[in-house]
Structure formats: structure tokens, C-alpha cells
Amino acid sequence: MRRRARELAMRALFAHTVGGMGLEEAFQHALEEMGGEEEGYAEPLDQEGVAFARRLLSGYKAHQEEVDRVLEETVEGWDFRQMAKTDLAVLRLAVYEMLYEPTPFEPLIEVAVKIANRYGGEHSGSFVNGVLARVYRRVAAGELKTVAKEA
């Protein structure tokens, strides 16, 4: 269910960024789109999933400056304007989660790659994986601080 919640958050952030909608309006729009059964999912998103998606979005917005700075420092040779907006939305939420949520790194990165593959272009999954692996190396080297992770 968390993967689907992350997809909801990504779709809302994408609509907010690209469509110029307010964040709450974008969230409601994405929630309505995902309200029914969707390809690859047997059940609609539950309230816990909706709450988790909201937490990711509000957390990213609260830490947007720091998350974007980390991404800019990590993504070499890319400007946010050049990046596919789906990839950017996935990366922003994943980096927020890496730094500020207790989710373990490996499943978080794995799900981000799957979402990028589903919504992005041909090379989105490998691009997202490479960027998040570099963020992880920065964390492991002590360059970036994170909250304690769940076991």
C-alpha cells in the first residue's frame, strides 16, 4: 500500500509542478484519479495510504529548499529544467523520505525506481536509481544527516 501512496504523492507533486495547481487541489485531483481500482492494484488506496501520501507531500514542501539543494549537489550535469518532470517529482519525494522519514533506504529506493519506470521514460528507472544511490553514498559517508531508520 505504501508504493501506491508514494505514487499518489508523486502524481500530486507532478500536477502541482507542471499544472500550476495548488498543492491541495493537485492532491485531490490525483486522489480522484487513483480512487478506483487501477492497473496492477487489487484494492483502492486506504486512509492510511492517503495519510502517508499527504505526509510525504507536506514534508517535502516543508523541506523543499534542503531537498532541492541536496538534489542539485548530487545530480551532476543536469538542471531541473532539463529533467523529466516525472523523474524530478519521484526524486524530490524519495530524497525527502531518505532524509526525514524512518523508511529503510533499500525498499525506498526500489519503490522509487519502480514508480519512475511506470510513469517516466525509457531510462527513468536507471536515472532515478543512480541519483538515489549517490544520495545514499553521501549519507553513508556522513556528508548528509538523516533520521534514524526502521530496522
From Swiss-Prot:
Pfam families: NusB. GO terms for biological process: DNA-templated transcription termination; transcription antitermination. GO terms for cellular component: cytosol. Keywords: RNA-binding, Transcription, Transcription antitermination, Transcription regulation. GO terms for molecular function: RNA binding. Gene3D superfamilies: NusB-like. InterPro entries: NusB-like_sf (IPR035926), NusB_fam (IPR011605), NusB_RsmB_TIM44 (IPR006027). It comes from the Bacteria. The keyword tRNA processing does not apply. Involved in transcription antitermination. Required for transcription of ribosomal RNA (rRNA) genes. Binds specifically to the boxA antiterminator sequence of the ribosomal RNA (rrn) operons. NCBIfam families: nusB. Belongs to the NusB family. This is Transcription antitermination protein NusB.
